[in-house]
Amino acid sequence: MAHPRLAWELASSGHGARQTAYRIQVRAGGAGWAGSLVWDSGKVTSANSVGVAYGGPALKPRTRYAWRVKVWDGQGKASAWSAPRWWETTLSPEEWGASWIGVDNPEPLDFTGAAWIWATGASVENAPVGTRWFRSHLDLPGDGEVLKATVVATADDDFTLYLNGREAVRAPQQQDGWRSGRTADVTGEVKEAAGVVLAVSATNRAGASVNPAGLLVRLRVETSTGRTYELLSDAGWRVTDTEQQGWQEPEFDDSAWHPAVALAPYGQGPWGTGVSVAVQEQPAPLLRREFEVPGRVSRARLYVSGLAYYEARINGRRVGRQVLDPGFTDYDETVLYTVHDVTELLRRGANAIGVSLGRGFFGMTTPNVWNWHRPPWHSEPRLIARLEIEHPDGSRTALVTDDEWRITEGPTLSNSLYAGETYDARREPGPWTSPGFDDSTWRTATVQSAPKGSLRAQPHDGIEVIDSFNPERTTRLAPGVHLVDMGRTMAGWARITVRNLPEGTSLQLTYGEKLKPDGSVSAETSHVPGRFQRDEYICAGREEETWEPAFSYKGFRYVQVSGLPETSDDAWRILGRLVHTPLDEVSSFACSEPFYEWLDRAMRRTVLNNMHGIPTDTPMYEKNGWTGDAQLGTPVMTYAFAMHRMLSKWLGDLADSQTDDGQLPVIVPSGGWGYGDLGPSPEWTTVYPFLIREFYRVYGDEHAAREHWTTLTRYLDWELSRLREGLAVTALGDYLAPGYGGNPPEDTRLTATAYLYRALLDTAEMGEVLGAGDVVTRYRKAAEQLKTALNAAFLGADGHYRTAKDPDYRQTSNAIPLAFGLVPDNARDSVFASLVRDVERRGNHLNTGALGTSVLLRVLCAHGRPDLAHAVATQRTYPGWGYWHDNGADSMWEMWPLDSRSRDHYFQGTAAQWLYENVAGLRPGDAGYATFTVRPDARTGVDWARTSIRTVRGTAGVAWSQTAGGFSMEVRVPVGAIAEVHVPAASREEVTAPDGARHLRTDSGFVIYRVPHGTWRFTS
């Protein structure tokens, strides 16, 4: 950033304080305020205290700058100078002097030479439904050591493969599972035997009228002699249609079985070359380097990026608090690095640095529906780093990643954000991050090509372990199997400690948000076939061992621990670790209705559980940056937490994801999925203009609009270019309405058009701020045309919105136009009346999906029915938040029924916005709370409420109470802001207002005043 933006918060007693001018000074280098002066703004006449750009000479890289500010008040009186604050610049691109290093990408094993086989009676068009059992063998001559053995297999539809009697690889029960080949490293198993027997059970599931079956296998064995031996599926295999005792054991006699039928060589038949084989996963690499520090250290910085994740240690001590670092991006566009102050970790003389690397979304090997196992950037983990050391005499010592580093395979055998991690403690190399460690058996790290993305300093706070929790209870399910209940829904992982367990003991930790009927953990998903949310720890046999994952996180409440010997309870213990991006809580909410306070707590918890460098949809099932979820959740996020840095980063991700023609995907970042898959969808992707507008509203940040203006307008122009009959089209809609497991039944063009309409107006408003008059005019005209087309298509003669696809009245189809200002004046009453009738007809229940839910309560209040909003909000039967609450929820769920897939999904929890804006009554205005409104119009069922938020200008707040004797309200306005205060009363004569409060008008049961800075008390 060439021009850092500076801000300060002002405080003053009394009323009406304001800033009239400021002066900024900046010094470079030195400690505190000791450096040389590089910029003095002089006295600048301005009330602005937010986003003031540095205006001095070009900043130098790797330099600390201190700054301070003084201001003048309304009487022209100058303040004292503020205490100095500082920023530090990072490396320029040409200063790295480092190479990306790591291991070479393995050659994937394909099915070359193998044939699709099945039993007699099958053809390439069809085969009987059911399971068949196959066997074959490979003799090894024993003239050399087995260096590597790999097997790859698939079946139409699923299979389990055994090697010498041990299960080696499987595909879970599914249809069309043949599309994903499964790979396993079986080197250890093959080394133990003179030959190999493969035994496979494969199942053809009932399917379409054309339902072929087939098994495809290739085993490859590499030896020290340079010779390679293979076992391929072909007509030489044996098959039977009856399972027999011991059929998978190597000594089983299969002579009575029948020869298999070779249906087609790989690449032919109905399967073609459509099998995708994920690259076989290699253990997480460890990289190290020893180095000398020639003298005392005055300052040291480590600039580092490890893809997808890294953990670094210097002289045995951990670098930084971050985990799962750096943040996830589209690696073909942007690669983030972090900067660490490591001054205290270094010493004169011998030093060592060690880094371990994880896969994340950069090198994932777990097949999944979003294709994260094969994005365009997919590669093995790699590292770039520069350690720069400053000495008291001004000299510098630098260490960079190059081919002098050493590398080996570490004890983390596999790591996946979806599947979990396998860690073999027997492979721990000892104190490998300390000097003097013998790394003679390690290899030389190889220089790798750089990712395509630009290397940039990470702009947001890295993910951290935020808190730790002891379990609420532990239950024995079966011998060696225990269920741990953490007592809360959370994102993160479990840390396990064991004592005196035998070497080689394998413990499995399976994580889930809910339980199956038998009391075990539910941890399955069709989106990620096979292993899911399961860690495995293999014990080293020490007196005490403690381990926790390093490169994956889970969404869970329950942890099922399996593989424990039947020993005393004190042989093991679990600690829950809460993990997310650290976000300061900037607001509070409280009221006399306990259920409303639960809503607030549950929503805040759910939001935090989904903050991992990007705003995700669910920490358990997907971990994707669904744009629609973020759009619906942003008002709550920005009110509850300090979101500016993290959402600024995600705005960059949105820009990176844009195609040349302007399209945005429904998940961001994206590896290619979400454009044609469930896209385009304006209800989701208009998050881009919405966020930019909210940045100005909440933070006074107009820089975001300037930075993104070209990509923003390109996106909106693309949306306008594809209108049909004047309406926007979409692949999504009011998702997960009651009774529907996905899209709603109505014509989704209604909501698509409404969201595009709002996006055009949001962008036109920002265009006015930036002075982009041509865009303002064009987008306002386009918005009016959309409004006209929407009303012509969907506003019926009976006075409410309906579509030709409606099975019945649709609440969202009427609530969204009311919320977005799309309803013509002469139809507003009838549209609202229809909405009220339907809510009441349903026994005061909502009938909305995620889109309608976000506006329903606020619409009811805006049109004078806070009593109905209260009835809906507090409803305890399906569908409603109270239904979740009474069934044990402590977070927001994805769907209204009890069998909701995710129980940690914030997009149905947006009622929290209504709590802040209507129950407590504090609503953001614009320009970083330069203006805001206080209007508590949802007081039904509530005796008192209060909320406060620390804005960029200071704390704004409201606290009100009502009794039979009257109403009282206290409003707090920070310096530099003006509040419009709506006091419940029929007339001005009923209100006691403080001196200095300017009366504006009386409207709809409220007497309205304007007040500047200060604390103000009103009664009525």
Language-model features, listed with the residues they occupy:
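Active-site acid/base region of carbohydrate-active enzymes
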Residues: Y309, V400-E409, S568-A602, L608, ...
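C-terminal capping/lid segments that line or modulate ligand- or cofactor-binding pockets
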Residues: I353, Y423-D424, E622, A640, ...
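Non-catalytic C-terminal accessory modules of carbohydrate-active enzymes
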Residues: H373-W377, R382-E388, A398-G436, A457-S468, ...
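Extracellular/oxidizing-compartment recognition motifs
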Residues: M1-R64, R68-Y621, D629, R645-M646, ...
